[in-house]
Amino acid sequence: MKKVWLNRYPADVPAEINPDRYQSLVELFEHAATRYADQPAFVNMGEVMTFRKLEERSRAFAAYLQQGLGLKKGDRVALMMPNLLQYPVALFGILRAGMIVVNVNPLYTPRELEHQLNDSGAAAIIIVSNFAHTLEKVVEKTSVQHVILTRMGDQLSTAKGTVVNFVVKYIKRLVPKYHLPDAISFRSALQHGYRMQYVKPEVVAEDLAFLQYTGGTTGVAKGAMLTHRNMLANLEQVKATYGPLLHPGKELVVTALPLYHIFALTMNCLLFIELGGQNLLITNPRDIPGLVKELAKYPFTAMTGVNTLFNALLNNKEFQQLDFSSLHLSAGGGMPVQNVVAERWVKLTGQYLLEGYGLTECAPLVSVNPHDIDYHSGSIGLPVPSTEAKLVDDDDNEVAPGEAGELCVKGPQVMLGYWQRPDATDEIIKDGWLHTGDIAVMDEDGFLRIVDRKKDMILVSGFNVYPNEIEDVVMQHSGVQEVAAVGVPSGSSGEAVKLFVVKKDPALTDDALITFCRRHLTGYKVPKQVEFREELPKSNVGKILRRELRDEARGKVDNKA
Protein backbone atom coordinates (compact mmCIF):
# COMPACT_ATOMS: atom_id res chain seq x y z
CA MET A 1 0.00 0.00 0.00
CA LYS A 2 1.32 3.41 -0.97
CA LYS A 3 2.06 5.62 2.05
CA VAL A 4 -0.55 8.24 1.16
CA TRP A 5 -0.57 9.41 4.78
CA LEU A 6 2.87 10.97 4.42
CA ASN A 7 1.32 13.77 2.36
CA ARG A 8 -0.83 14.68 5.36
CA TYR A 9 2.03 14.75 7.88
CA PRO A 10 2.68 18.21 9.34
CA ALA A 11 5.81 19.78 7.83
CA ASP A 12 7.76 19.26 11.07
CA VAL A 13 7.06 15.50 11.31
CA PRO A 14 9.59 13.24 9.51
CA ALA A 15 8.63 10.22 7.42
CA GLU A 16 11.27 8.07 9.10
CA ILE A 17 12.84 7.84 12.55
CA ASN A 18 16.16 6.48 13.78
CA PRO A 19 15.42 3.62 16.21
CA ASP A 20 19.12 3.18 16.95
CA ARG A 21 19.88 6.58 18.50
CA TYR A 22 20.39 4.77 21.81
CA GLN A 23 21.64 1.24 22.29
CA SER A 24 19.18 0.55 25.11
CA LEU A 25 16.65 2.09 27.46
CA VAL A 26 19.43 2.02 30.05
CA GLU A 27 21.58 4.32 27.92
CA LEU A 28 18.60 6.63 27.33
CA PHE A 29 17.84 6.78 31.05
CA GLU A 30 21.42 7.42 32.14
CA HIS A 31 21.79 10.15 29.52
CA ALA A 32 18.62 11.88 30.76
CA ALA A 33 19.59 11.44 34.41
CA THR A 34 22.88 13.22 33.78
CA ARG A 35 21.44 15.99 31.63
CA TYR A 36 18.48 16.76 33.89
CA ALA A 37 19.99 15.69 37.24
CA ASP A 38 18.49 18.38 39.46
CA GLN A 39 15.12 18.62 37.76
CA PRO A 40 12.04 16.78 39.07
CA ALA A 41 11.35 13.46 37.36
CA PHE A 42 8.35 12.20 39.34
CA VAL A 43 6.01 13.68 41.92
CA ASN A 44 3.49 11.69 43.95
CA MET A 45 1.44 12.73 46.99
CA GLY A 46 3.38 16.00 47.05
CA GLU A 47 6.78 14.28 47.19
CA VAL A 48 9.25 15.21 44.43
CA MET A 49 11.92 12.80 43.17
CA THR A 50 14.61 14.40 41.01
CA PHE A 51 16.44 12.66 38.19
CA ARG A 52 19.48 12.49 40.47
CA LYS A 53 17.55 10.71 43.23
CA LEU A 54 15.97 8.36 40.70
CA GLU A 55 19.40 7.52 39.29
CA GLU A 56 20.84 6.84 42.76
CA ARG A 57 17.90 4.77 43.97
CA SER A 58 17.55 2.73 40.78
CA ARG A 59 21.30 2.04 40.81
CA ALA A 60 21.04 0.80 44.40
CA PHE A 61 18.05 -1.35 43.51
CA ALA A 62 19.88 -2.82 40.52
CA ALA A 63 22.84 -3.63 42.77
CA TYR A 64 20.55 -5.37 45.25
CA LEU A 65 18.96 -7.50 42.52
CA GLN A 66 22.43 -8.50 41.33
CA GLN A 67 24.35 -8.92 44.57
CA GLY A 68 21.67 -9.32 47.22
CA LEU A 69 19.42 -11.73 45.34
CA GLY A 70 21.97 -13.19 42.95
CA LEU A 71 19.80 -12.60 39.90
CA LYS A 72 21.36 -12.56 36.44
CA LYS A 73 20.92 -10.69 33.20
CA GLY A 74 17.80 -11.94 31.43
CA ASP A 75 15.98 -12.98 34.62
CA ARG A 76 12.35 -11.89 34.78
CA VAL A 77 11.27 -9.61 37.62
CA ALA A 78 7.59 -8.83 38.21
CA LEU A 79 6.28 -5.40 39.21
CA MET A 80 2.85 -5.30 40.86
CA MET A 81 1.86 -1.85 42.07
CA PRO A 82 -0.14 1.26 41.17
CA ASN A 83 1.45 4.62 40.36
CA LEU A 84 3.87 5.22 43.23
CA LEU A 85 7.42 6.59 43.36
CA GLN A 86 8.59 3.02 43.95
CA TYR A 87 7.52 2.08 40.43
CA PRO A 88 10.13 4.06 38.43
CA VAL A 89 12.83 3.18 40.97
CA ALA A 90 12.12 -0.53 40.54
CA LEU A 91 11.51 -0.25 36.79
CA PHE A 92 14.82 1.39 35.98
CA GLY A 93 16.60 -0.74 38.57
CA ILE A 94 15.43 -3.91 36.82
CA LEU A 95 16.41 -2.58 33.39
CA ARG A 96 19.81 -1.34 34.60
CA ALA A 97 20.50 -4.81 35.99
CA GLY A 98 19.91 -6.21 32.50
CA MET A 99 16.76 -7.98 33.61
CA ILE A 100 13.30 -8.15 32.06
CA VAL A 101 10.33 -6.28 33.51
CA VAL A 102 7.07 -8.21 33.86
CA ASN A 103 4.30 -5.71 34.58
CA VAL A 104 1.40 -7.14 36.58
CA ASN A 105 -1.99 -5.53 37.13
CA PRO A 106 -2.25 -5.20 40.94
CA LEU A 107 -5.99 -5.92 40.78
CA TYR A 108 -5.43 -9.41 39.42
CA THR A 109 -7.08 -12.33 41.16
CA PRO A 110 -4.93 -15.19 42.50
CA ARG A 111 -5.73 -17.27 39.40
CA GLU A 112 -4.60 -14.54 37.01
CA LEU A 113 -1.49 -13.75 39.03
CA GLU A 114 -0.42 -17.38 39.27
CA HIS A 115 -0.67 -17.81 35.51
CA GLN A 116 1.39 -14.73 34.70
CA LEU A 117 4.14 -15.46 37.22
CA ASN A 118 4.50 -19.05 36.05
CA ASP A 119 4.23 -18.27 32.35
CA SER A 120 6.94 -15.60 32.59
CA GLY A 121 9.08 -17.63 34.97
CA ALA A 122 9.49 -14.58 37.19
CA ALA A 123 12.24 -15.10 39.75
CA ALA A 124 11.25 -12.13 41.91
CA ILE A 125 8.33 -9.80 42.45
CA ILE A 126 8.07 -6.28 43.86
CA ILE A 127 4.59 -5.80 45.28
CA VAL A 128 2.75 -3.19 47.32
CA SER A 129 1.36 -4.51 50.63
CA ASN A 130 -2.25 -3.72 49.66
CA PHE A 131 -2.16 -6.71 47.31
CA ALA A 132 0.18 -9.02 49.23
CA HIS A 133 -2.75 -11.21 50.31
CA THR A 134 -3.29 -12.13 46.65
CA LEU A 135 0.32 -13.19 46.24
CA GLU A 136 0.26 -15.17 49.49
CA LYS A 137 -2.40 -17.49 48.05
CA VAL A 138 -0.29 -18.55 45.07
CA VAL A 139 3.38 -17.75 45.66
CA GLU A 140 4.27 -21.32 46.67
CA LYS A 141 2.85 -22.56 43.35
CA THR A 142 4.94 -20.18 41.23
CA SER A 143 8.52 -19.72 40.08
CA VAL A 144 9.00 -16.74 42.40
CA GLN A 145 11.98 -17.11 44.76
CA HIS A 146 12.15 -13.57 46.15
CA VAL A 147 9.41 -11.21 47.34
CA ILE A 148 10.16 -7.51 47.86
CA LEU A 149 7.37 -5.81 49.74
CA THR A 150 6.64 -2.10 49.85
CA ARG A 151 4.02 0.10 51.48
CA MET A 152 2.25 3.03 49.85
CA GLY A 153 4.29 5.69 51.63
CA ASP A 154 7.72 4.08 51.59
CA GLN A 155 9.30 6.53 49.14
CA LEU A 156 7.84 9.62 50.81
CA SER A 157 9.64 11.66 53.47
CA THR A 158 9.74 9.91 56.85
CA ALA A 159 6.98 11.97 58.46
CA LYS A 160 4.66 11.94 55.46
CA GLY A 161 5.33 8.29 54.70
CA THR A 162 4.54 7.25 58.27
CA VAL A 163 1.22 9.08 58.14
CA VAL A 164 0.29 7.67 54.73
CA ASN A 165 1.13 4.10 55.76
CA PHE A 166 -0.87 4.45 58.99
CA VAL A 167 -3.93 5.88 57.24
CA VAL A 168 -3.85 3.31 54.44
CA LYS A 169 -3.59 0.37 56.85
CA TYR A 170 -5.57 1.39 59.92
CA ILE A 171 -7.98 4.16 58.88
CA LYS A 172 -8.91 3.19 55.33
CA ARG A 173 -8.18 -0.51 55.99
CA LEU A 174 -6.80 -1.03 52.50
CA VAL A 175 -4.25 -3.68 53.50
CA PRO A 176 -5.88 -7.09 54.03
CA LYS A 177 -3.99 -9.44 56.33
CA TYR A 178 -1.24 -11.45 54.69
CA HIS A 179 1.60 -13.77 55.67
CA LEU A 180 4.80 -13.58 53.62
CA PRO A 181 7.49 -14.26 56.24
CA ASP A 182 10.40 -14.44 53.79
CA ALA A 183 9.67 -11.11 52.11
CA ILE A 184 12.18 -8.27 52.35
CA SER A 185 11.06 -4.66 52.48
CA PHE A 186 11.71 -2.31 49.58
CA ARG A 187 13.40 0.11 51.97
CA SER A 188 15.76 -2.61 53.19
CA ALA A 189 16.54 -3.63 49.62
CA LEU A 190 17.58 -0.05 48.83
CA GLN A 191 19.61 0.28 52.04
CA HIS A 192 21.50 -2.92 51.23
CA GLY A 193 21.86 -1.89 47.60
CA TYR A 194 23.56 1.38 48.46
CA ARG A 195 26.34 -0.65 50.10
CA MET A 196 26.70 -3.08 47.20
CA GLN A 197 28.63 -2.86 43.96
CA TYR A 198 26.48 -2.25 40.88
CA VAL A 199 27.94 -4.08 37.90
CA LYS A 200 26.74 -2.53 34.67
CA PRO A 201 25.85 -5.33 32.25
CA GLU A 202 26.14 -5.03 28.49
CA VAL A 203 22.58 -4.40 27.33
CA VAL A 204 22.03 -4.25 23.57
CA ALA A 205 19.10 -3.20 21.43
CA GLU A 206 17.85 -6.73 20.73
CA ASP A 207 17.77 -7.75 24.41
CA LEU A 208 14.31 -8.15 25.91
CA ALA A 209 13.20 -5.23 28.08
CA PHE A 210 9.59 -6.22 28.83
CA LEU A 211 7.27 -9.18 28.87
CA GLN A 212 4.06 -7.20 28.58
CA TYR A 213 1.06 -9.48 29.01
CA THR A 214 -1.97 -9.35 26.78
CA GLY A 215 -4.67 -11.71 25.63
CA GLY A 216 -3.66 -11.24 22.00
CA THR A 217 -6.27 -12.91 19.82
CA THR A 218 -7.26 -15.56 22.39
CA GLY A 219 -8.18 -15.56 26.04
CA VAL A 220 -4.91 -17.02 27.33
CA ALA A 221 -2.70 -14.20 28.59
CA LYS A 222 0.56 -14.16 26.64
CA GLY A 223 3.74 -12.16 27.14
CA ALA A 224 4.55 -9.83 24.26
CA MET A 225 8.34 -9.84 23.93
CA LEU A 226 9.33 -6.19 23.63
CA THR A 227 13.01 -5.49 23.09
CA HIS A 228 14.90 -2.35 24.02
CA ARG A 229 14.84 -1.47 20.30
CA ASN A 230 11.06 -1.95 20.09
CA MET A 231 10.55 0.49 22.94
CA LEU A 232 13.17 2.97 21.71
CA ALA A 233 11.64 2.92 18.24
CA ASN A 234 8.17 3.65 19.55
CA LEU A 235 9.56 6.43 21.73
CA GLU A 236 11.16 8.00 18.66
CA GLN A 237 7.88 7.61 16.77
CA VAL A 238 5.91 9.30 19.54
CA LYS A 239 8.53 12.04 19.85
CA ALA A 240 8.52 12.65 16.10
CA THR A 241 4.74 12.91 16.10
CA TYR A 242 4.21 15.02 19.22
CA GLY A 243 7.69 16.52 19.54
CA PRO A 244 6.78 19.87 17.97
CA LEU A 245 4.37 20.41 20.88
CA LEU A 246 6.87 19.49 23.59
CA HIS A 247 9.75 21.38 25.18
CA PRO A 248 12.62 19.38 26.74
CA GLY A 249 13.11 20.06 30.42
CA LYS A 250 9.90 22.06 30.75
CA GLU A 251 7.03 19.55 30.64
CA LEU A 252 4.76 18.22 33.38
CA VAL A 253 2.57 15.32 32.27
CA VAL A 254 -0.43 14.07 34.23
CA THR A 255 -0.04 10.31 34.66
CA ALA A 256 -3.41 9.05 35.81
CA LEU A 257 -3.27 5.90 33.71
CA PRO A 258 -1.36 3.08 35.43
CA LEU A 259 2.28 2.76 34.44
CA TYR A 260 1.90 -1.02 34.24
CA HIS A 261 -0.29 -0.38 31.16
CA ILE A 262 1.74 -0.12 27.95
CA PHE A 263 0.14 3.20 26.94
CA ALA A 264 1.24 5.08 30.05
CA LEU A 265 4.53 3.19 30.24
CA THR A 266 5.63 4.48 26.84
CA MET A 267 3.71 7.75 26.48
CA ASN A 268 4.23 9.04 30.00
CA CYS A 269 7.06 7.32 31.82
CA LEU A 270 9.62 6.69 29.09
CA LEU A 271 8.85 9.61 26.76
CA PHE A 272 8.96 12.24 29.46
CA ILE A 273 12.09 10.72 31.01
CA GLU A 274 13.83 11.22 27.68
CA LEU A 275 12.49 14.78 27.46
CA GLY A 276 13.55 15.66 31.01
CA GLY A 277 9.91 16.13 31.91
CA GLN A 278 8.07 15.57 35.16
CA ASN A 279 5.47 12.83 35.69
CA LEU A 280 2.68 13.69 38.12
CA LEU A 281 1.78 10.21 39.38
CA ILE A 282 -1.85 9.70 40.34
CA THR A 283 -2.15 6.62 42.54
CA ASN A 284 -5.94 6.34 42.50
CA PRO A 285 -7.46 7.91 39.37
CA ARG A 286 -10.92 6.64 40.31
CA ASP A 287 -10.98 9.25 43.05
CA ILE A 288 -11.86 12.07 40.68
CA PRO A 289 -12.20 14.77 43.39
CA GLY A 290 -8.78 13.78 44.74
CA LEU A 291 -7.30 13.80 41.24
CA VAL A 292 -8.68 17.28 40.55
CA LYS A 293 -7.19 18.56 43.83
CA GLU A 294 -3.78 17.33 42.67
CA LEU A 295 -4.21 18.95 39.25
CA ALA A 296 -5.00 22.28 40.90
CA LYS A 297 -1.51 22.32 42.47
CA TYR A 298 0.51 22.04 39.26
CA PRO A 299 0.76 23.90 35.91
CA PHE A 300 0.40 20.68 33.91
CA THR A 301 1.39 20.87 30.25
CA ALA A 302 0.38 17.44 28.95
CA MET A 303 -2.19 14.81 29.79
CA THR A 304 -2.90 11.32 28.55
CA GLY A 305 -6.01 9.33 29.26
CA VAL A 306 -8.86 7.19 28.06
CA ASN A 307 -12.36 8.31 27.19
CA THR A 308 -13.79 7.31 30.57
CA LEU A 309 -11.24 9.45 32.43
CA PHE A 310 -11.76 12.51 30.25
CA ASN A 311 -15.53 12.13 30.59
CA ALA A 312 -15.36 11.82 34.39
CA LEU A 313 -13.17 14.92 34.64
CA LEU A 314 -15.45 16.95 32.40
CA ASN A 315 -18.37 16.11 34.69
CA ASN A 316 -16.53 17.42 37.76
CA LYS A 317 -17.33 21.05 38.60
CA GLU A 318 -13.96 21.71 40.24
CA PHE A 319 -12.16 20.44 37.13
CA GLN A 320 -14.09 22.95 35.06
CA GLN A 321 -12.56 25.74 37.17
CA LEU A 322 -8.91 24.73 36.63
CA ASP A 323 -6.36 26.80 34.75
CA PHE A 324 -5.59 25.13 31.42
CA SER A 325 -3.32 27.86 30.06
CA SER A 326 -0.20 25.65 30.29
CA LEU A 327 -1.80 22.61 28.61
CA HIS A 328 -0.61 21.98 25.05
CA LEU A 329 -0.91 18.21 24.59
CA SER A 330 -3.98 16.07 25.28
CA ALA A 331 -3.65 12.50 24.03
CA GLY A 332 -6.36 9.85 24.13
CA GLY A 333 -5.92 6.14 23.55
CA GLY A 334 -6.81 2.70 24.82
CA MET A 335 -10.41 3.00 23.61
CA PRO A 336 -12.33 5.23 21.17
CA VAL A 337 -12.81 8.84 22.24
CA GLN A 338 -16.48 9.72 21.94
CA ASN A 339 -17.37 12.79 19.86
CA VAL A 340 -19.28 14.46 22.67
CA VAL A 341 -16.32 14.05 25.04
CA ALA A 342 -13.87 15.41 22.46
CA GLU A 343 -16.09 18.41 21.77
CA ARG A 344 -16.54 19.23 25.45
CA TRP A 345 -12.79 18.84 26.04
CA VAL A 346 -11.74 21.35 23.40
CA LYS A 347 -14.46 23.76 24.51
CA LEU A 348 -13.19 23.68 28.11
CA THR A 349 -9.42 23.40 27.63
CA GLY A 350 -8.87 24.92 24.21
CA GLN A 351 -6.93 21.78 23.22
CA TYR A 352 -8.00 19.08 20.80
CA LEU A 353 -7.86 15.52 22.07
CA LEU A 354 -5.37 13.80 19.78
CA GLU A 355 -6.68 10.26 19.51
CA GLY A 356 -4.31 7.43 18.75
CA TYR A 357 -4.34 3.68 18.31
CA GLY A 358 -2.00 0.98 19.39
CA LEU A 359 -1.66 -2.45 20.88
CA THR A 360 0.66 -4.08 23.35
CA GLU A 361 2.34 -6.01 20.56
CA CYS A 362 3.48 -2.67 19.03
CA ALA A 363 4.90 -1.07 22.18
CA PRO A 364 2.06 0.29 21.65
CA LEU A 365 1.70 3.16 19.15
CA VAL A 366 0.62 2.45 15.57
CA SER A 367 -1.23 5.60 14.52
CA VAL A 368 -2.11 9.05 15.86
CA ASN A 369 -3.93 12.13 14.70
CA PRO A 370 -1.53 14.84 13.50
CA HIS A 371 -0.68 17.54 16.03
CA ASP A 372 -1.93 20.32 13.75
CA ILE A 373 -5.46 18.97 13.39
CA ASP A 374 -8.15 21.47 14.37
CA TYR A 375 -11.17 19.18 14.59
CA HIS A 376 -12.08 15.82 16.10
CA SER A 377 -11.64 13.44 13.20
CA GLY A 378 -13.23 10.45 14.92
CA SER A 379 -10.45 8.40 13.35
CA ILE A 380 -7.38 6.77 14.86
CA GLY A 381 -5.20 9.06 12.78
CA LEU A 382 -2.24 8.38 10.49
CA PRO A 383 0.36 5.61 10.80
CA VAL A 384 3.36 6.90 12.75
CA PRO A 385 6.78 7.42 11.06
CA SER A 386 8.68 4.32 9.87
CA THR A 387 5.46 2.30 9.94
CA GLU A 388 3.88 0.44 7.05
CA ALA A 389 0.16 -0.28 7.09
CA LYS A 390 -2.17 -2.23 4.85
CA LEU A 391 -5.73 -3.53 4.91
CA VAL A 392 -6.36 -7.12 3.82
CA ASP A 393 -9.28 -9.47 3.24
CA ASP A 394 -9.68 -12.97 4.67
CA ASP A 395 -7.33 -14.33 2.00
CA ASP A 396 -4.61 -11.81 2.90
CA ASN A 397 -5.11 -9.82 -0.29
CA GLU A 398 -5.06 -6.02 -0.04
CA VAL A 399 -8.52 -4.50 -0.35
CA ALA A 400 -9.42 -1.70 -2.75
CA PRO A 401 -9.13 1.92 -1.52
CA GLY A 402 -12.04 2.85 0.72
CA GLU A 403 -12.95 -0.78 1.46
CA ALA A 404 -12.78 -2.37 4.90
CA GLY A 405 -10.07 -4.87 5.71
CA GLU A 406 -8.00 -6.19 8.58
CA LEU A 407 -5.35 -3.67 9.63
CA CYS A 408 -1.84 -5.09 9.35
CA VAL A 409 1.28 -3.18 10.37
CA LYS A 410 5.03 -3.51 10.02
CA GLY A 411 7.68 -1.43 11.74
CA PRO A 412 10.53 -1.38 14.26
CA GLN A 413 8.05 -1.19 17.15
CA VAL A 414 6.50 -4.62 16.39
CA MET A 415 7.30 -7.21 19.07
CA LEU A 416 9.57 -10.19 18.56
CA GLY A 417 6.65 -12.49 19.30
CA TYR A 418 4.87 -14.09 22.24
CA TRP A 419 7.02 -15.51 25.04
CA GLN A 420 7.49 -19.27 24.51
CA ARG A 421 4.46 -19.45 22.20
CA PRO A 422 5.74 -19.82 18.63
CA ASP A 423 2.40 -21.05 17.29
CA ALA A 424 0.55 -18.03 18.66
CA THR A 425 3.29 -15.80 17.23
CA ASP A 426 2.91 -17.36 13.79
CA GLU A 427 -0.83 -16.72 13.92
CA ILE A 428 -0.43 -12.97 14.41
CA ILE A 429 2.86 -12.18 12.58
CA LYS A 430 3.03 -13.33 8.96
CA ASP A 431 5.93 -12.32 6.70
CA GLY A 432 6.80 -9.57 9.15
CA TRP A 433 3.27 -8.13 9.14
CA LEU A 434 1.43 -8.02 12.45
CA HIS A 435 -2.27 -8.76 11.98
CA THR A 436 -4.11 -6.59 14.50
CA GLY A 437 -7.49 -8.31 14.31
CA ASP A 438 -9.13 -4.91 13.85
CA ILE A 439 -11.16 -4.11 10.75
CA ALA A 440 -10.44 -0.63 9.41
CA VAL A 441 -10.96 1.65 6.43
CA MET A 442 -8.49 4.24 5.16
CA ASP A 443 -9.54 7.46 3.46
CA GLU A 444 -7.69 9.18 0.61
CA ASP A 445 -5.49 11.12 3.06
CA GLY A 446 -4.43 8.02 4.97
CA PHE A 447 -6.63 8.51 8.04
CA LEU A 448 -7.61 5.15 9.52
CA ARG A 449 -10.96 4.40 11.11
CA ILE A 450 -11.72 1.21 13.04
CA VAL A 451 -15.11 -0.15 11.97
CA ASP A 452 -15.17 -3.56 13.64
CA ARG A 453 -13.06 -6.13 15.41
CA LYS A 454 -12.24 -9.36 13.71
CA LYS A 455 -11.51 -10.85 17.05
CA ASP A 456 -14.19 -10.94 19.72
CA MET A 457 -12.16 -8.88 22.16
CA ILE A 458 -14.08 -6.54 24.45
CA LEU A 459 -12.54 -3.15 25.28
CA VAL A 460 -13.42 -2.00 28.82
CA SER A 461 -11.95 1.39 29.80
CA GLY A 462 -8.92 0.74 27.62
CA PHE A 463 -8.27 -2.78 28.93
CA ASN A 464 -8.59 -5.86 26.72
CA VAL A 465 -11.12 -8.43 27.91
CA TYR A 466 -11.24 -11.76 26.12
CA PRO A 467 -14.48 -13.78 25.99
CA ASN A 468 -12.65 -17.11 26.21
CA GLU A 469 -11.27 -16.25 29.64
CA ILE A 470 -14.62 -15.00 30.95
CA GLU A 471 -16.42 -18.06 29.62
CA ASP A 472 -13.84 -20.42 31.13
CA VAL A 473 -14.46 -18.88 34.55
CA VAL A 474 -18.26 -18.86 34.24
CA MET A 475 -18.31 -22.51 33.15
CA GLN A 476 -16.72 -23.43 36.48
CA HIS A 477 -20.02 -22.51 38.16
CA SER A 478 -22.00 -25.68 38.77
CA GLY A 479 -25.25 -24.00 37.74
CA VAL A 480 -24.10 -23.14 34.20
CA GLN A 481 -24.60 -25.36 31.17
CA GLU A 482 -23.46 -23.02 28.39
CA VAL A 483 -22.24 -19.44 28.20
CA ALA A 484 -21.20 -16.81 25.70
CA ALA A 485 -19.58 -13.50 26.65
CA VAL A 486 -19.91 -10.46 24.40
CA GLY A 487 -19.21 -6.75 24.60
CA VAL A 488 -22.04 -4.24 24.69
CA PRO A 489 -21.84 -0.43 24.62
CA SER A 490 -21.43 1.27 27.99
CA GLY A 491 -21.53 5.00 28.56
CA SER A 492 -19.07 4.81 31.43
CA SER A 493 -16.48 2.35 30.12
CA GLY A 494 -16.92 2.22 26.35
CA GLU A 495 -17.92 -1.42 26.50
CA ALA A 496 -19.06 -3.81 29.22
CA VAL A 497 -19.22 -7.60 29.41
CA LYS A 498 -22.60 -9.25 28.92
CA LEU A 499 -23.23 -12.97 29.46
CA PHE A 500 -25.73 -15.15 27.64
CA VAL A 501 -26.26 -18.22 29.81
CA VAL A 502 -28.09 -21.52 29.54
CA LYS A 503 -28.83 -22.76 33.05
CA LYS A 504 -28.01 -26.17 34.40
CA ASP A 505 -29.52 -25.23 37.76
CA PRO A 506 -32.96 -23.58 37.36
CA ALA A 507 -32.40 -21.66 40.63
CA LEU A 508 -29.33 -19.83 39.29
CA THR A 509 -29.65 -16.02 39.43
CA ASP A 510 -27.73 -13.27 37.68
CA ASP A 511 -26.61 -11.83 41.03
CA ALA A 512 -25.16 -15.18 42.10
CA LEU A 513 -23.27 -15.51 38.82
CA ILE A 514 -21.84 -11.99 38.96
CA THR A 515 -20.77 -12.55 42.58
CA PHE A 516 -19.03 -15.76 41.48
CA CYS A 517 -17.21 -13.87 38.72
CA ARG A 518 -16.02 -11.20 41.16
CA ARG A 519 -14.15 -13.89 43.08
CA HIS A 520 -12.22 -15.03 40.02
CA LEU A 521 -11.86 -12.01 37.76
CA THR A 522 -10.36 -8.53 37.95
CA GLY A 523 -13.03 -5.83 38.33
CA TYR A 524 -13.07 -4.60 34.75
CA LYS A 525 -13.58 -8.18 33.48
CA VAL A 526 -16.62 -8.85 35.68
CA PRO A 527 -19.85 -9.07 33.64
CA LYS A 528 -22.31 -6.22 34.13
CA GLN A 529 -25.28 -7.96 32.49
CA VAL A 530 -26.59 -11.53 32.40
CA GLU A 531 -29.32 -12.81 30.10
CA PHE A 532 -30.62 -16.36 30.50
CA ARG A 533 -31.59 -18.33 27.38
CA GLU A 534 -33.06 -21.73 26.66
CA GLU A 535 -30.34 -22.21 24.02
CA LEU A 536 -27.54 -20.31 22.31
CA PRO A 537 -27.17 -19.88 18.54
CA LYS A 538 -24.59 -22.22 17.01
CA SER A 539 -22.92 -22.87 13.69
CA ASN A 540 -23.37 -26.14 11.84
CA VAL A 541 -20.34 -27.52 13.65
CA GLY A 542 -21.67 -26.51 17.05
CA LYS A 543 -19.64 -23.35 17.61
CA ILE A 544 -21.49 -20.69 19.58
CA LEU A 545 -22.09 -17.68 17.36
CA ARG A 546 -20.84 -14.86 19.55
CA ARG A 547 -21.15 -12.28 16.79
CA GLU A 548 -24.87 -12.98 16.39
CA LEU A 549 -25.42 -12.52 20.12
CA ARG A 550 -23.27 -9.41 20.16
CA ASP A 551 -25.16 -7.82 17.27
CA GLU A 552 -28.47 -8.67 18.94
CA ALA A 553 -27.36 -7.24 22.28
CA ARG A 554 -26.07 -4.07 20.66
CA GLY A 555 -29.28 -3.72 18.70
CA LYS A 556 -31.24 -3.72 21.96
CA VAL A 557 -28.98 -1.02 23.37
CA ASP A 558 -29.36 1.07 20.20
CA ASN A 559 -33.14 0.71 20.27
CA LYS A 560 -33.26 1.87 23.89
CA ALA A 561 -31.18 4.89 22.95
From Swiss-Prot:
Protein name: Long-chain-fatty-acid--CoA ligase
NCBIfam families (UniProt xref): PRK08974.1
Cofactor(s) in the UniProt record: Mg(2+)
A GO biological-process term: fatty acid beta-oxidation
Superkingdom in the source lineage: Bacteria
Gene: fadD
PANTHER family: LONG-CHAIN-FATTY-ACID--COA LIGASE
Localization terms from the record: Membrane
